[in-house]
């Protein structure tokens, strides 16, 4: 049995006071397992955001997002087209074979403002 996760290291945002239509609801905090799990349970996910400092310089900060409206997939209602079903039959599927490699493959280093950095890879690997 795994050890219980530590609590979030900072107070997460109360979404009931978030402005309607605002997707970015907080900036800051850290990517430790307790914070990640607490955030996901509250409908938040982390993704870096570009910020402009007082001198006009730009940098990245950890943003916490809760899209409004949020896209939700209901598996029981999912309609799979024939072309998708055909494509899926030609694929190999596995579970828990190479978690870190999969996360790294989701990162696109050539994409401007790509947010899956090594910090994210390490955080999700620790959580996994």
Residue spans for each PLM region:
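N-acyltransferase acceptor-side catalytic subdomain
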Residues: 1-128
